[in-house]
Amino acid sequence: MNVLITGGAGFLGLQLARLLLQRGTLNLDGQPVAIKRLTLLDVVAPQGLDDARVRVVTGDLSDPAVLRQAIDTDTGAVFHLAAVVSGQAEADFDLGMRVNLDASRALLETCRELGHQPRVLFTSSVAVYGGQLPPVVQDDTALNPQSSYGVQKAIGELLLSDYSRRGFVDGRVLRLPTISVRPGKPNAAASSFASGIIREPLSGVAANCPVAPETPLWLLSPRAAVAALVNGIELAGERLGNRRVVNLPGLSVTAAGMIEALRRVAGNAVADRVTWEREARVENIVGTWPAAWNAERALALGFQSDASFDEVIRAYMEDAGLAK
């Protein structure tokens, strides 16, 4: 079987790729199916993967010719992770629409044309919610995105659900909490600070938190996110029924709570490297996101959250070689 990861050069795509190569199979319909080829599609080539099963396709995801290079009749599973992040999609409307919406539709059409109904997993976001939200968002809480990124993700959810209803693909959507702690450098996402205020101080660098200390965030670690992606693709479509979207479990933590966890794990000197200068551009986006949602359905489907944000920090330190 060919497995495709769009956004395969990104940090989550690379972590997923490494896990799939290590496993060597996906359990589909109760049977292990060998991953004979792992195709990574992105605008740049991924680094650090030396495996004969890996095939790299670089190009514009919205180009049908590029998609036809990546998706063929042997493609049994597609992880669609590629996206223009929230802050960038807000700053460049046309780019966000082309990558987050047009490319998603083009991917679905390519799968439809092949006619073999592959499993297709889309990642969505807390950004599909907004406005006046209940303290805990439910699975049936109305979508009301307050950013272009959130709108694009919401439309993608509906498209994948309808392509599944029509039998074109076997789709599933995972609404990811904000992923923290991401490795690497800051990006243009409005939520980038949720990793930076932990990652940079641990590296000896000062970091600013652009939101108020009491701002709540719904968080998930990279390890838990990758495990969720695998569980999501392996779920039988019958278990999802006509509700193809799943709100993943997470941790509800305030910005101040994150720094207190950092203080407990790494000490005062590290935590004191965080400054607090609010930025309206970031707050106007992040402030519309839910602080927590009811994940009972996700838990029943086998998805798991992190035990605590202290453990999230420790896991990041271990992965980054910073553990004491």
Curated annotation (Swiss-Prot):
It catalyses: D-erythronate + NAD(+) = 2-dehydro-D-erythronate + NADH + H(+). The active site is at 149 (proton acceptor). GO terms for molecular function: oxidoreductase activity. NAD(+) binds at residues 125, 149, 153. Keywords: Carbohydrate metabolism, NAD, NADP, Oxidoreductase. SUPFAM superfamilies: NAD(P)-binding Rossmann-fold domains. It comes from the Bacteria. Its EC number is 1.1.1.410. InterPro entries: DenD (IPR050005), Epimerase_deHydtase (IPR001509), NAD(P)-bd_dom_sf (IPR036291). Disruption phenotype: Deletion mutant is unable to use D-erythronate as a carbon source. Belongs to the NAD(P)-dependent epimerase/dehydratase family. NCBIfam families: ErythonDh. Catalyzes oxidation of D-erythronate to 2-oxo-tetronate. Can use either NAD(+) or NADP(+) as cosubstrate, with a preference for NAD(+). PANTHER family: ADP-L-GLYCERO-D-MANNO-HEPTOSE-6-EPIMERASE, NUCLEOSIDE-DIPHOSPHATE-SUGAR EPIMERASE. This is D-erythronate dehydrogenase.
